[in-house]
């Protein structure tokens, strides 16, 4: 024996998650387009709420996030009793995996799905089965083919990060219909507020019509609250009961809850941000394509630019950094030839487009 505390082997089966960078050495003004944060920051009402609640930061928050759940219910016409809030949606994702997975069981996801699913699953001792995709979009038939008697959870990010692709509601419904009833389907709709397609459903209808589906959402993107960490899940009552047993007692801070309630009440915020995102995304995609690079279709607040080779993507990233611009390399997702670029303000989008145009002319 070593005489030292020993962690479970599963802890060392995954590398630590690395988020988008925020700083560059020697650069005072950084344009951060690496974490899919909202272009305009938090709504003014949320900022005011954070300031106001600071005076009572010594008080423990409501452990059940009652007022926040009621506000979410009002905004999205949902039953607050079927809502669970957490310290970001990844908190709830990890709780679902801990609660329904375990050693020897399996989680199914698409090939380029969100990394947190695999990390949390492996930490829980699960095996991860990744289904091949079609044109960087989840292939429902391929996902169903990966399901075995050991499968306990199926995760689908819709729209997906980092590709931005979307699976129509009819296909998601078919996925659920063909899963065994004891397999939990988790629909991660972190980017739902950005979608304008009529054939999209974030998961509400499937949660309402069955007992094995959960929808997760976040305040980190459209509502600009990534720094306070706030997410929520909509689920059948039996799953809500499980999450309330496994989550920590105060997993939503008072400031986070106050900011979330205020953000939901901000008049016109979602419409303003969505309209900007749709227009700016279209314009930036066109400029990147004119610079000579492929851009994959996106329904989220980011674009995936294809530089064809890993070396070229790395060179482009270095060039952008020299201009004070941080985007996201996505080699960890199996896409070393790509860069993920958040849709920022008009000025930020113009700056990154100019830099990529210059790279294309001088390094193409």
Curated annotation (Swiss-Prot):
SUPFAM superfamilies: PLP-dependent transferases. Signal peptide: none annotated. Pathway: Amino-acid biosynthesis; L-histidine biosynthesis; L-histidine from 5-phospho-alpha-D-ribose 1-diphosphate: step 7/9. It comes from the Bacteria. GO terms for molecular function: histidinol-phosphate transaminase activity; pyridoxal phosphate binding. Its EC number is 2.6.1.9. The keyword Transferase applies. Pfam families: Aminotran_1_2. The modification N6-(pyridoxal phosphate)lysine is found at residue 221. Keywords: Amino-acid biosynthesis, Aminotransferase, Histidine biosynthesis, Pyridoxal phosphate, Transferase. Its cofactor is pyridoxal 5'-phosphate. PANTHER family: HISTIDINOL-PHOSPHATE AMINOTRANSFERASE, HISTIDINOL-PHOSPHATE AMINOTRANSFERASE 2. This is Histidinol-phosphate aminotransferase.
